[in-house]
Amino acid sequence: MGTFLVPELIRLGYAVDVISKDDVHSDNPDLRYYQADFCNDGIRNEFLDKNYDVIINFMHYHTDVFRNIHPSLLSHTGQYFFLSSYRVYADEKVPVTEEAPRLLDVSKDAGLLASDDYAIAKCRCEDILHASGKKNWTILRPAIIYSHANLYTFKLVSLNGDLVMPRTRMGKPVVLPREAMNIHAAMTWGGDVGKMVSRLVDNPAAMGEIFTISSAEVNTWGGIAECYKNAVGLQYALASKDEFLDILSNNPEDRECQRWGLDYDRLFDRVIDNAKVLKATGLKQSDFMPIRDGLKLELEAAANTPAPFNKAASARMDSFLSKQG
């Protein structure tokens, strides 16, 4: 997300410090990079002592960790951005608005609720902010974001770029669950995410508020598969949900986590009403990149980038396809 957000912030006149594990250099006096690990308590406290006007935090926290560190995060900045996810939403309201019920509040899946799964942890961290007694936070609930800067973000249903990209380059089909093909999906170009988030910075309308960060464009997973096909020649075959999960993982615990992600997100109709973020930022839906154009742009930009490769899942995919004749 930072790949597109940082230039937007610089363009809007902000001075930006970026903390990254990568060694990055800048010739812009308003942009400084620090190679550091923000998870380290000592390093984090060093940066918090700078008392930034705004902190935009893209890290994922388990609930217990965030409960311990959120007081210092909130007390050392004027506005703290917490990265949640649109995955917190249950499947009870279409289109989805910020007031839609959350999984944590309505799910009957005891195993999910007993876990600190990604979506559940996000819900609980949101609740921690609400209970903090402060209002200098802004919660971001982004939909699926794609960008050439991270090839893992080229997603298709539950597949990540470590299967979509290498198999497409090898001319091999990917396997998708047929149950998902007519389900609506929410994917947004990273550049549009940068536009939305940058305009919430130092914005009084964003204080103590939650925003779904997404285009309102409506597509099905089948339609998005066709966008990949048109952009880079992706081929795909269909399987049942159970067959698809068997391909993703042969570890029972991990398979259950994959099932949660499929059943409680990718198989939910994700039609987004983004009126709230449009109102707060002054943007219009027409300002956003259509997914067919955005995917083509980012896939072309990533054409010469080595792709991560999930060899084990790819081998299971090959095995499944060989049995189909």
Give names to the regions the model predicted.
Residues H70-R124, H130-S132, T138:
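Conserved Rossmann-fold NAD(P)-dependent oxidoreductase catalytic core, especially the SDR/UDP-sugar
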Residues P95-E126, F154-D162, I183-M187, G191, ...:
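Short-chain dehydrogenase/reductase
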Residues E126-F154:
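Conserved beta-loop-beta element that borders a ligand/cofactor-binding pocket
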Residues L156-M165, P177-V201, G208-E209:
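Substrate-positioning beta->alpha
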Residues L176-I183, F211-V218, K229, Y264-D265, ...:
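Glycine-rich Rossmann NAD(P)(H)-binding loop
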Residues M196-G261, N274, K296-L297, A302, ...:
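Mid/C-terminal beta-alpha module of Rossmann-like enzyme folds, strongest
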